[in-house]
From Swiss-Prot:
Organism: Polaromonas naphthalenivorans (strain CJ2)
Cofactor: Mg(2+)
Gene symbol of the encoding locus: pyrE
Protein name (database record): Orotate phosphoribosyltransferase
Pfam families: Pribosyltran
Any GO BP: 'de novo' pyrimidine nucleobase biosynthetic process
Length: 237
């Protein structure tokens, strides 16, 4: 489910100002040339990561009120999901919701506690926390790990839903990775913001007297048409 409008717009502005959401020409995993790029790895200091966790927590608590979303613990898939899961768990605890969290290693450890899982025991309804969902590979791998541990994959929280067609065998299909996870795998997906929110942000900045200058001095209105054209070519509803 998408975030409430003002929260989504606030998040998009934060991502742009932090340099996490950038504009230009970027090649995606699917081989497309995208006019924007969301790099969650650039939430790279305590203040930015802490604020990012606040957005996740606000969206999750809002979704709890809106749809009854409930979960018993948090799981972060390696690698980007690891700090996200920890940060979101800290923020939820600060807000009075103290939940266990866990994550996985890419490589199994053959000494100490061993295995690929670290943190709390996977049990109950598990929320998977990641940055974006391009092909859904990390989510499918997480689902397999969670089920193998005897727990239930219940929902996924991401920062940005790109709202674009997924690919299968190198060909575009008429659904996004998020829609596949929702419809075929039966997991609720909560996104802080979507591509439609980014377009709204760019449109509103384009109409401002300043033309919406970014941190590098470029005008955001210069990117609106390219992002819109990308959405029209590859987008899903």
């Amino acid at each position: 489910m998408p975030a409430e409008g003002s929260l989504a717009q606030e998040f998009v502005q934060f991502a742009v100002e932090s340099g996490v959401l950038r504009f230009g020409q970027f090649k995606t995993k699917a081989g497309r040339m995208s006019p924007y790029f969301f790099n969650a790895g650039l939430f790279d200091d305590g203040a930015k990561l802490g604020r990012l966790a606040q957005f996740y927590a606000r969206q999750l608590l809002a979704e709890e009120q809106r749809s009854g979303l409930a979960f018993d613990m948090i799981f972060g898939p390696a690698y980007k999901g690891i700090p996200l899961a920890a940060a979101v768990a800290i923020e939820l605890a600060r807000l009075g919701r103290n939940l266990p969290f866990a994550y996985n290693r890419k490589e199994a450890k053959d000494h100490g506690e061993g295995g690929t899982l670290v943190g709390a025991k996977l049990q109950g309804r598990v929320l998977i926390v990641d940055d974006v969902m391009s092909a859904g590979t990390a989510v499918r791998e997480s689902i397999a790990l969670i089920q193998a541990a005897g727990a239930t994959p219940h929902a996924v929280a991401i920062a940005l839903d790109r709202q674009e067609k997924a690919t299968e065998n190198g060909l575009d299909v008429e659904h996004s990775a998020v829609q596949y996870v929702t419809r075929q795998l039966g997991l609720q997906v909560c996104a802080i913001a979507r591509l439609s929110d980014l377009l709204q942000y760019l449109s509103e900045k384009s109409d401002s007297p300043s033309g919406g200058e970014t941190l590098d001095g470029q005008r955001l209105k210069d990117h609106y048409q390219s992002v819109l054209a990308y959405r029209e070519r590859y987008g899903v509803n």
